[in-house]
Amino acid sequence: MGDYQLTILSPQGDAWDVTERVSTLSWSGSVKRVSRQIEAVMATPNDGSLPELPCDLGNELRLSVQGAQRFLGHIVTREKATDSSTTELTGLDRGRFLSGNEGWYTFSGTAPEAAVRALCADFGIPVGSLAETGVQVARKYPGVALSKMVDSLYTMAAEQNGKRYLSRFNGAGELEVVEKPEAAALEIAPRKNLQTLRVTEDISGLQNAVAIYTDTGRLVRTVSDGESAALYGQFQHILTQRDGEDAGAEAQAWLEDNGLQQTMTVECLGDPALISGNAVLLRDNTAQAAGLCWIDADTHTWKNGQYFCRLTLNFRNLMNETAAGREIGR
């Protein structure tokens, strides 16, 4: 299985290539979770026929796929039964330091990217590229998880500029916040890499009208999807528009995020570029599911010499919208 390499490193810097001891490996992520995860089933016979593996909790895990490092994290769980010749390991990347640490911050007139860089510096979390938003925000976070702060800061930016953002850790273990793409560089198609496709359609959470009010209760205007309302009935959401602001972009984004949900579950040949947040061009007219999609969740699996992916695709470009903290002065 030479298309990947799994390495364990001790705190002292000793490194072990354990690739040949792996029977099954999965590498997964989601737009709803900042951490990517590794799960590995390792051969650890009880008869001493193989050397013991350095599977101590906290040891560093590195995964390289097709020659490029894709994951840097640590072992967080280890499981072995007395009647089993395997050990199961779970590793999480450095996103767990964002979700597992809480902070107390007040940001006023600050660009989200500057705020994120500052809080990461306080906690020693490496930072790579952070998307520039062109806006400033104000928010108080009294005892809030750092991951929620990051997503909340960029959610506020998205409400102003209409863009979509994703926070994740790259293969070097650095936090990056990227603007989600509007075009696809990857393609999934029959007779190329597509194996199976299942389509799910859902209107159980539909909201197709947004009424914009002032904070005194005066209706400013209503933004709606008339075609959806005619087909399924009207379901209304309320937005409060503050003085000097225009909630039009936020209202339009709400309609897009809460319209008819059509998701696809795809199994395809493995490609390390098929990770959550990226865009793909899906071509499969037989299931009436074709066009530009975004990956909401991904699981990459290596087993029995095979490498394949299971993806959750969405025709809507979603971000992990998060409301955290409170307004300054409250």
Question: PLM ranges: what are they?
Answer:
Residues 1-97, 189-196:
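Assembly/oligomerization scaffold segments
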Residues 2-10, 163-305, 315-330:
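Acidic, small/polar-enriched beta strand-loop surface segments
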Residues 20-21, 64-91, 166, 281-312:
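Short beta-strand and beta-hairpin "edge-sheet" elements
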Residues 38-41, 85-91, 174-176, 265-267, ...:
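A generic structural motif
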Residues 50-63, 100-108, 278-283, 323-330:
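Extended Gly/Ser/Thr-rich low-complexity repeat segments
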Residues 86-95, 129-198:
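Short beta-strand-centered interaction patches in the first periplasmic/extracellular domains
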